[in-house]
């Protein structure tokens, strides 16, 4: 978008926010859930170019009368395994979008344990264009342990092939916490590869100095 177009949009948004110009869309008479102040606010919500520009009393080119219905931010599921549901991404979206979930962060380590990179590619391809935003964390532990028999083994060099995909956010739950704290070479290669990305953790019983070692390995979150 050109700089002049951005400036023009800003001028329009400011005028609409001040009530000097009609919004393109207004949700009228809603019970607005304010998740910051834990309040329910009765009023209108003005929208311009897909962006909320004001809450209060507004008029719009198009108005939708909510008549006291609740208006709230949608939910984001920060960690989910789509394949655990035994349905496709499209069917999964049909089940959760009507219930207010519009974004999920998927860790496809179950399908990857069976189909490897092809399983991850399937999730990425089949979730394209859905009314649900699907982001992916690449599975860090395929297989989960060396004692398992799996359909694939994913090393750092395999994950590298997908890490720059647009909807890939980082490295999925690092269940192999012994590998982290004991400096396993394969595990350290993955942690190094994703050092500038989000790395999810999964260390339910780790504590004290081992926990310190786990965290300095680059783990950003905890599954439990």
Annotate each language-model stretch with its function:
Residues 34-38, 85, 150-152:
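Short loop/turn motifs at secondary-structure junctions and domain boundaries
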Residues 69-92:
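Di-metal (Zn2+ and/or Mg2+/Mn2+) metal-binding site signature of metallo-dependent hydrolases
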Residues 185-193, 199-224:
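Functional cores that coordinate and move charged inorganic groups
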Residues 2-16, 93-200:
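Divalent-metal coordination cores built from histidine and acidic residues
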Residues 76-83, 171, 200-202, 223:
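Histidine-centered divalent metal-coordination motifs
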Residues 4-74:
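Histidine-rich, glycine-flanked metal-binding segment
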Residues 30, 50, 68, 79, ...:
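Divalent metal-coordination and catalytic microenvironments
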């Amino acid at each position: 978008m050109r700089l002049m177009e951005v400036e023009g949009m800003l001028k329009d948004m400011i005028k609409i926010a001040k009530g000097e110009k009609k919004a393109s869309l207004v949700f009228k008479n809603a019970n607005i859930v304010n998740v910051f102040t834990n309040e329910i606010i009765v009023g209108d919500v003005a929208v311009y170019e897909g962006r909320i520009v004001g809450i209060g009393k507004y008029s719009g080119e198009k108005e939708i009368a909510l008549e006291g219905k609740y208006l709230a931010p949608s939910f984001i599921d920060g960690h989910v395994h789509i394949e655990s549901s035994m349905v496709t991404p499209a069917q999964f979206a049909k089940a959760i979008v009507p219930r207010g979930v519009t974004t999920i962060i998927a860790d496809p380590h179950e399908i990857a344990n069976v189909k490897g990179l092809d399983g991850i590619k399937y999730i990425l391809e089949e979730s394209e264009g859905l009314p649900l935003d699907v982001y992916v964390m690449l599975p860090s532990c395929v297989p989960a342990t060396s004692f398992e028999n799996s359909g694939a083994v994913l090393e750092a060099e395999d994950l590298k092939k997908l890490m720059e995909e647009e909807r890939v956010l980082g490295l999925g739950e690092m269940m192999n916490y012994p590998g982290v704290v004991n400096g396993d070479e394969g595990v350290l290669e993955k942690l190094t590869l994703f050092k500038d990305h989000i790395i999810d953790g999964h260390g339910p019983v780790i504590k004290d100095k081992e926990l310190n070692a786990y965290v300095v390995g680059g783990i950003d979150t905890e599954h439990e």
